[in-house]
């Protein structure tokens, strides 16, 4: 086996030993640190030696050689393992690098990421090149492999085939299969998917569920089929039910499911005292949700709700690393681990004043010391969206009165419109809008109506969607066209238009899905978009999720997909797609 297949080469390992022998200097020394020992579950005093990206020693001794060493006096400070996000969807307007850069400022340095966007938009070789590029940034980036597209796909079987899935599962940076948004297929006889689950287990990797509202019997069956963890519990009782069936339970706090306070309160009321099978996730929230951090907020919430302080930190670090079989390099401050370390002012405040990621300062005494971006997206075939087609007014005909009634950010039900939709502009007296999904390649469209999205919006166009297709929604067809033409000019984005002029835009030049902006700038743009939509009658809090999930057939009850307007419960097509007037 070649040296490059190991994390550290033989030569590097010899250098690490030389530091213990006193013949080589470490690069950093955290002196007099009060640190969380994840194994003894105690706060202990120690000196922590770091060389390059590795913890070399933790204990009472000081290095003999200090000529190349930066000494940091940690007296009065508290040192904990940096936090891990085990369930990231790193394409929610931000991109994986800008998300990581932002989250590292709040102590989260390790991410286990969804591969779905890469799977949809890049060839496998291009995706794997990108995964290799991500090893070069200070954050530790890992991935999961989807088994389905969480919507009805035109080319679903060709995309999700055994050759592709197995190659992804075999990649060393891929730690799990799932999430299993198509679990009913698995449960009802899809043996190809079951084989992928089996292969995941054979590779000693994990399988992540997606089981909202699942009964005890369903949870038991899916555990028998190979699932290890689920993040969809919405009550303490649901979390306990998963624990009782042998799952690791991922407690979620996201922009559309901010459930953590309820989950913790109810688990404590149910008498739960042992938390080593619980972990935290924010489940791919949109930018503004992360304005004040990521995992740090969940730790603070847990402490506030009465979870023992050490358990709160363990659920954000050690428990996750142990679950994913990477405890030998992550999740603890101990000899041999990657140097991902947070320095805190107090145990009760999980926002670090300083953060070390892979042995590098990314935050020092409250100052961001890592703002540089390293990923050259164009070299990875991640480029602006090129729409070599257009739509005509004649494409914007609406006759089918069966539509989508939005009940919250993402849940829908079918409804029948009772207003006149054979017009160029809908009345603001009703909360109904035109809705179009148009194929990314311009070959087809689905026209319908949506109730409950907004009352006074002119037009919104978005290349950000669950399938990468184009979404248009609005009261006024001219404004919908104005917004559409602007996303073409931008190479992708989300655009609001009013009175034939662009009111607000978020450029998404990376595949039409992701921004290149720093997270702080993107947060302000998203907040403005939300405010503008709420002023125009959007009554929920996350319109980007609403748009993303218009096509999501893993959620009830009616969705717009490439096969048409689709009734999820019956599996029937309510209205079929049609070709655009002009074919390009």
From Swiss-Prot:
Entry's Gene Ontology molecular function annotations: adenine deaminase activity
InterPro entries: Adenine_deam_C, Amidohydro-rel, Metal-dep_hydrolase_composite, Metal_Hydrolase
Residues that span the membrane, as ranges: none
EC number per UniProt: 3.5.4.2
Keywords associated with the record: Hydrolase
One Pfam family in the UniProt entry: Amidohydro_1
Recorded catalytic activity of this chain's protein: adenine + H2O + H(+) = hypoxanthine + NH4(+)
Family per record: Belongs to the metallo-dependent hydrolases superfamily. Adenine deaminase family.
Protein's name according to its UniProt entry: Putative adenine deaminase BA_3032/GBAA_3032/BAS2818
UniProt source species: Bacillus anthracis
């Amino acid at each position: 086996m070649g040296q490059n297949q190991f994390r550290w080469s033989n030569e590097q390992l010899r250098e690490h030993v030389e530091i213990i022998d006193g013949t080589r200097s470490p690069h950093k020394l955290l002196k007099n640190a009060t640190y969380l020992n994840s194994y003894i579950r105690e706060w202990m005093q120690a000196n922590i030696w770091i060389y390059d990206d590795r913890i070399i020693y933790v204990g009472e001794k000081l290095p003999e050689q200090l000529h190349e060493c930066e000494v940091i006096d940690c007296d009065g400070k508290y040192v904990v393992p940096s936090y891990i996000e085990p369930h990231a969807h790193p394409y929610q307007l931000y991109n994986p690098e800008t998300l990581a850069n932002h989250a590292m400022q709040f102590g989260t340095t390790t991410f286990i990421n969804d591969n779905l966007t890469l799977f949809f938009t890049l060839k496998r070789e291009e995706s794997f090149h990108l995964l290799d590029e991500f090893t070069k940034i200070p954050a530790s980036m890992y991935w999961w492999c989807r088994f389905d597209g969480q919507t009805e796909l035109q080319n679903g079987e060709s995309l999700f085939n055994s050759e592709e899935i197995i190659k992804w599962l075999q990649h060393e940076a891929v730690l799990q299969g799932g999430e299993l948004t198509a679990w009913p297929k698995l449960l009802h006889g899809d043996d190809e998917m079951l084989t992928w689950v089996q292969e995941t287990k054979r590779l000693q990797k994990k399988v992540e569920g997606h089981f909202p509202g699942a009964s005890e019997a369903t949870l038991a069956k899916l555990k028998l089929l190979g699932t290890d963890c689920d993040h969809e519990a919405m009550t303490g009782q649901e979390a306990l039910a998963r624990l009782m069936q042998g799952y690791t339970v991922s407690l979620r706090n996201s922009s559309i499911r901010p459930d953590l306070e309820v989950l913790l309160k109810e688990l404590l009321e149910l008498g739960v005292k042992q938390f080593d099978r619980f972990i935290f996730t924010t489940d791919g929230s949109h930018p503004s949700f992360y304005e004040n951090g990521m995992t740090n907020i969940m730790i603070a919430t847990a402490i506030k709700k009465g979870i023992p302080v050490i358990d709160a930190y363990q659920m954000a670090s050690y428990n996750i690393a142990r679950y994913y079989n990477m405890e030998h390099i992550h999740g603890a401050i101990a000899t041999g681990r990657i140097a991902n370390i947070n320095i805190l002012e107090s145990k009760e405040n999980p926002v670090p004043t300083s953060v070390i990621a892979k042995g590098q300062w990314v935050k020092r005494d409250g100052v961001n010391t890592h703002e540089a971006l390293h990923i050259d997206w164009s070299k990875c075939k991640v480029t602006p969206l090129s729409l070599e087609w257009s739509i005509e007014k004649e494409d914007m005909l609406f006759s089918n009165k069966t539509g989508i009634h939005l009940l919250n950010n993402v849940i829908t039900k079918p409804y029948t419109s009772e207003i006149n939709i054979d017009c160029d502009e809908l009345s603001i007296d009703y909360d109904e809008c035109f809705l179009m999904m148009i194929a990314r390649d311009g070959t087809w469209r689905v026209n319908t109506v949506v109730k409950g999205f907004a009352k006074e919006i002119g037009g919104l166009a978005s290349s950000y969607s669950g399938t990468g297709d184009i979404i248009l929604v609005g009261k006024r067809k001219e404004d919908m066209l104005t917004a559409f033409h602007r996303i073409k000019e931008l190479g992708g984005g989300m655009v609001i238009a009013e009175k034939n002029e662009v009111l607000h835009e978020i450029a998404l030049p990376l595949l039409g899905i992701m921004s290149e902006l720093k997270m702080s700038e993107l947060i302000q743009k998203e907040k403005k978009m939300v405010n503008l939509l709420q002023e125009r009658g959007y009554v929920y809090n996350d319109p980007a999720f609403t748009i993303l999930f218009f096509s999501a057939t893993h959620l009830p009850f009616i969705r717009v997909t490439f096969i048409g307007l689709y009734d999820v419960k019956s599996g029937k097509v309510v209205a079929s797609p049609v070709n655009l007037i002009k074919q390009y």
